[in-house]
Regions:
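Alpha-helical transmembrane segments and immediately membrane-proximal extracytoplasmic
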Residues: 1-487
Length: 487
């Protein structure tokens, strides 16, 4: 009996020892892999910080040149033709923009290095000619390009590559906007609707803070506003914030619809892509020059500051929205986030003036809420508010973020986003689909109104969204991994 007990104990010790050795070896491999990704994240972040500084410097330079030479708005048709020709003939699917970055993150599709170069050059050209665009889209594409190519160089695969891509996105946001907290969460949240990828948290935090630090160290400057007065928490204030959140979400939905509608109408009117680029650029130039709308060109960074101090009107919000849709919806490169800041701030300033008698507080809420609801990134929105305005209005940022997020629905600027958690339980059938799939499935009342005006245009818009999302491409271009029904 004693010998049997001793034998059993020896066997148990042997098994336990083996498991300990196996667990230790596995932990060592995981630590080694994590350390490798961390080191590569630092490399990507430093490179993105330098690229972000160079990009911001180029935008400041061409903006100064344009403001001193308003005749440059006449170059909009030429710039658009050159841009769409380059992307059509040499872009290697780079025209999908941030949707390609999303798919690359989730499926492992490689991003060719020329995407970053093209978006840098063409976005700068857009701002030189006065197109109403931002900088986030270009920055994220540059960050995604850097991360994808660094990953390919060091043969990073699977989840490690995905973490590196998200870190590159975070580094881009932090470097371009000077908001490291928001940048960290943006990388974890951008690819999904209803999910925050915590597994990439350390890398995204590292990427955003290093990208921001390097960009600032090289000379990038970021101007943030302050909220003059944060109202006390009361039922009246809460009710006004909720109503404002509804307005911001509706405006964000209108913004995304406007861009899709512009794509649809121009695609219907001008089937040839070069003719379409020339015509849309000419119409945009005529609007700027004919109506003297020069200050709405480019980033329009004056809008948030003016809104906080009550120097904007509701007209400013709608003009910036329309001109941005007529810019990014026809082929010009850039981004949408900075225009969203201005649109939301102007709308919020107007709401604040008529409800509280003070535009500053609502302008700040509108600035971040428009961004978050149009891009489906509510947690990033909260962090952006804290980055830009401090934590004093933190509770209000949380409320307005989620209200506007729910009102905006599943429609968003990035058709390739995967829906992981639906915004309402009644939409659970959307889980696993892309935003493009949802737009096609549910439609939109305003889109149906447009179809009533032009019945022959039915389906054009959803096809554009699906093409941007990567769910309808030529057979020879299909990615090796699926791009939809992601869970």
């Amino acid at each position: 009996m004693a010998w049997h007990t001793l034998g059993t104990a020896r066997t148990a010790l042997h098994i336990t020892g083996r498991r300990f050795v196996d667990d230790t070896a596995r932990d060592a491999r995981n630590i080694s892999a994590s350390l490798r990704v961390f080191i590569l994240t630092v490399v990507v972040s430093v490179l993105m910080g330098v690229a972000g500084w160079a990009f911001l410097l180029s935008l400041r330079t061409v903006t100064s040149i344009r403001e001193a030479n308003l005749w440059l708005f006449a170059l909009l048709p030429l710039v658009n033709v050159a841009t769409v020709w380059l992307y059509h003939n040499h872009g290697l699917r780079a025209s999908r923009g941030n949707n390609l970055v999303i798919d690359s993150t989730l499926t492992g599709t490689h991003i060719h290095a020329r995407m970053g170069l093209l978006t840098f050059i063409c976005s700068t050209a857009t701002h030189l000619a006065g197109g109403s665009a931002g900088r986030e889209g270009a920055a994220v594409q540059i960050g995604g390009t850097i991360a994808s190519n660094v990953g390919a160089l060091f043969k990073v695969r699977g989840h490690d590559r995905r973490d590196l891509m998200m870190a590159g996105i975070s580094a881009a946001f932090g470097a371009a906007f000077g908001t490291p907290l928001a940048g960290a969460f943006f990388g974890m949240e951008m690819c999904f609707v209803g999910k925050l990828d915590y597994s990439a948290g350390l890398y995204c935090l590292t990427g955003s803070f290093i990208g921001n630090a390097v960009s600032r160290m090289l000379g990038s400057e970021f101007a943030f506003q302050t909220i003059p007065v944060v109202p006390d928490l009361s039922l009246t204030t809460l009710a006004l914030v909720v109503l404002a959140g509804v307005a911001f979400g509706a405006m964000a939905r209108l913004f995304t619809l406007a861009i899709r509608t512009v794509k649809r109408l121009y695609g219907r009117l001008f089937p040839n892509y070069l003719v379409r680029a020339a015509a849309s650029g000419a119409i945009l130039a005529l609007l700027f020059i004919g109506f003297g709308l020069y200050r709405y060109g480019g980033l329009s960074e004056w809008l948030p500051g003016a809104a906080v101090h009550g120097q904007t009107t509701l007209t400013d919000a709608f003009l910036k929205l329309a001109l941005t849709a007529l810019t990014v919806g026809v082929g010009f490169q850039g981004g949408e986030v900075t225009p969203l800041f201005g649109i939301g701030a102007a709308l919020g300033g107007w709401i604040g003036t008529i409800t509280l008698g003070d535009p500053g507080f609502m302008a700040a809420l509108g600035m971040v809420a428009m961004f978050g609801s149009a891009l489906n990134v509510p947690i990033t929105t909260i962090m952006l508010g804290i980055d830009m305005f401090g934590s004093g209005a933190g509770a209000y940022f949380v409320i307005v973020s989620f209200i506007s997020y729910l009102v905006a629905g599943h429609r968003a600027l990035y058709p390739a986003q995967r829906i992981v958690t639906p915004k309402r339980r009644s939409l659970k059938q959307d889980v696993g689909l892309t935003v493009a799939d949802v737009i096609e499935r549910h439609g939109d009342p305003l889109e149906e109104l447009i179809e009533g005006i032009d019945p022959e245009s039915h389906g054009t818009d959803s096809n554009c969204d699906r093409a941007a999302a990567g769910t309808t491409v030529e057979p020879s271009e299909v990615d090796p991994s699926p791009t939809k029904h992601y869970k």
